[in-house]
Amino acid sequence: MVLYFIFTVFLSATLLFSVQPMVAKSLLPVFGGSSSVWTTCMLFYQTVLLLGYLYAHFVMKRVSRRVQLFGHIGMLVIALVAGYMFDSPSPPPSASTFPVPWLILQLALVSGLPFFMISSAGPLVQGWFARTGHTRSNDPYFLYAASNAGSFVGLLAYPFVIEPNLGLAEQRSFWLAGFGLFILMSFGAILMTKKGSHEDPHAPSGEVLAPSGDVDSGPAEDRPIDWRRRLRWTFYAFVPSSMLLGVTSHLSMDIASFPLLWVLPLAVYLLTMIVAFAADSNRLVKSLRRPMVIAIIGATILVLASEAQAYAPIKALVAVQLLLLGVVGLMGHSMLSSDRPSASHLTEFYLIMSIGGALGGVFNGVVAPLIFETTLEYPIVLVCAVALLPWRKIGEIEDPKLKRQAWMIRIGLPLLSLVYMQVMGRFSVSLVEWLGISLVDQTIVLFAIIIFIPTVMIYLAWNDGIACMLVLAVPLSASIYDDLTDPDIHFRGRTFYGILSVVDEFFYDIEVNQKITYRTLMHGTTNHGVQFLNPELTHVPLGYYHVDGPCGMAIQALKEIRPDGARYGIVGLGSGAITAHARPQDSIKYFEIDPEVAHIAEDPQYFTYLSEAECPVSVDLGDGRLLLERERDAGEEKYDMVLIDAFSSDSIPVHLLTTEAIQLYYDRLTDGGIVLLHISNRHLDLQPLVFNLGVDHQSYVMMYEQDIDEIPEDMLGYWFPSVWMALTKSPQTAQAMLDAGMFQEGEARFKVRMWTDQYSNILSAFNR
């Protein structure tokens, strides 16, 4: 019997945690591969999980065995049928900067009912076992260990076993088969309960992410549970939950939005909860103070040095973020564990924990995108995390000398940090210029000067949560204030698809003794467009689209093939810089998923590439691939070049690089046309994938990787190194590309499995 219940709860947890990345991955193509998809999914699943706990509590307390046997099992069967009926999400009816409501609707249709029922399984199975009359039924908490093991299996099996080997349709079929098996196991579990059992004082109602150790090893004394205590529980659960989503979004926005970068933070979060409830939580809280301060210092440096992240190794970025999440999660969950009530109040305790977790999802997934122009929720939760440190009660210190020292730390350090930031902000630039070092070294020294003293102060204040919180808030607030008041930032906005900003920069042209100003469009940490502001230079294409770069050379080759005019279909608008290459006889249609990007590119107060275009230019809003499919189905006129340049910050929307996508591009091409793909990426090597996709479609494959060494040093601010690949089925077009002198025939550096709409594996594309 024990093994039966262990397997049942193990199966339920495995299903619970494997369905989340599976459904989220199926939604990525519908919403442009945005990293916000997973944040919204977590919000939805945390909320449904809370509803599942409420349902389980109601069933165990109010529903008879007979009704459970037929009513609950009947609902499970309905959920299984619903899982088969709603198997594919639908795209939003129109482009939107905030499609969260539509995404939540799709989540509810595709997986809402099955997830709701499986989320109630943990407490229900434990409750059923408590009513079996087994010798261990008085203490069913050992089943939490099986639940936690199943959670890890479900989480880690998906990116390492399931995703690399199974397509989405196969994944869904296997999951629904597992759900069907769980229904049978649940039916048997209810049959094993004693007849007439309705309510048992030993039956727990907790969450899946609950203690795997001895729950009675150290609950807090049975103090009255007032609203202050409930608010503490909520806060202790809120901080790790918000940190989980912040770290996940931070990673997936600049690498790629894919399951491994979703489940690793979630696995760390789960592990911190298991350890916190299994260990001596009071001792754990004390031992975590210094590590937590050190981790937060590292995260603060990352926040303040956002540009440094662009050049940091991916492993270092992931390691620092996961370490921070682990320490903060362990602290928050240890605080929860040390304050947990006696067993008679566990139902309320776990319910409030789940409310705190859901609030973290609401804050990161809904509130922050609506009220913040940047990812302010990340530094905010950093400050909240410091508040988890024990607050020193200065009033209870009897020694006058120690009391004065405590006040000096709490008040003096924040004030000193504030004064230091003001002084350095005023004189640091003059100091590094006086040192006479290179521009790169100036940036490093300047950052070190500004961050050094506040970092030391944060560490000195580690023993007082209030002091540490105030000291941490100073450099973060100063950085945010400088960013908000920077006169060179002309636009800042946040949409479902990322953070956008329009920034002015300049350099001095020594040859003509003139100040040259240029404007950049930033998407996260990635530059998505550059334009000179000097009137005589606004028509010059810059950035990745410089006339002497790979994109410029490919367009020049097409002009020679199509002297009477060419039609361009371009997925990804940016600032519209490619328009500067066009002749009056050409025409361009852009496909852009983010309406805010279109607003920026079309508004001449920001960029004038579109408003000053010499040829007809149009912008269609929506996912580029879906719009191309609609054009194909409607039989619209084809293009001479389909250019794919759609980034989500520095990540690639996977659905634009599948074999079905390549076929679609060819369907929209005229004879002799070119598919041009921009594959520059800091972390992913997409060349082998694109080469194999091209060969699979009987294409000539060409590639040009322009290194930084090929660009004049004085032009690096507005001419960027980039990697482009070109596919064509025409030998004449291929020869024209090769004759341009830059593109070379592509070759496969190693073999990778081709991506399809049902299968993709980002792990295979990481830089080797």
Stretches found by the model and what they are:
Residues 1-742, 757-768:
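Alpha-helical transmembrane segments of multi-pass membrane proteins
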Residues 743-747:
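Low-complexity, Gly/Ser/Thr/Pro-rich intrinsically disordered linker/tail segments
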